[in-house]
Amino acid sequence: MSIIGAAVGIGAQDTRCRQGPDRLQACGLMARLADEPHGVSWSGTVREDTGVDVVYESARFCERLARKVYDALQNNPRIGVVGGDHSCAIGTWSGVYQAIAGNGPLGLIWIDAHMDSHTPDTSPSGALHGMPLACLLGHGPGALTGLGVSGPKLAPQHVCLIGVRSFEPAEAALLQKLGVRVFDMDQVRRHGLARVMDDALAYVQKNTAGFGISIDLDAIDPHDAPGVGSPVSAGICGKDLAESLSKMGRHPGLLGLEIAEFNPDKDVNNRTAKLVIDLLAATVGLRG
């Protein structure tokens, strides 16, 4: 696995999550992953430029990130991206999409307390980290929906959300109209995360060339992950998620894992940083 830092905060109201990749490095990310027998490498950090036009700067950043992801997948079977606000997902999965072009569609499991499916017309805040899934599905600013290759990078029937518990009606309406599968937090509590992840895996690997997992850390309960941009109570157990990722990591169709919205300034005793490292370690087959 090739690990890439996505040092971006321009898409969020609290921009301090741009510090996430550097803090993870300082907390021993690569030292922990060094024992992985098949090799885990650090491919560098893509950093945002700041400017007045947020959409323009975000598109420039995502273009660079997509290129980095694409290049990494030419020499590695999988990528890991650590952020950084969740607008980085537009770059991450655009890069994966381009890397597998011609082999088939991309499947994606989106683990998040929010739907991230606003458009500029529906977003109360205008923050781009509330729009990345909509952009990947082809709904949003042209500079972001047309990243790399024009058109949607994801088909609705190959996407599912897990852990949703905070959203606006316009987002739900868009996803319902498109037919995107949503496992909300009530379903996770009712059936257990392991079963929901199994169902999601079966869904996104059907008729696809491979699948990815995008995690917004606010999907996790704030007790386990306090260092996030937009915490929402009553979330997924961090340990349960690590166990599920350990299983997912053994699946040959997994193309990449993205972990976004780590805000070091809100962390408590590096609890969130350690959890991010544990999640990556579980995915590459290392025990805690």
Can you say where each PLM-predicted feature lies in the sequence?
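Active-site histidine-anchored catalytic micro-motif
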Residues: 77-147, 251
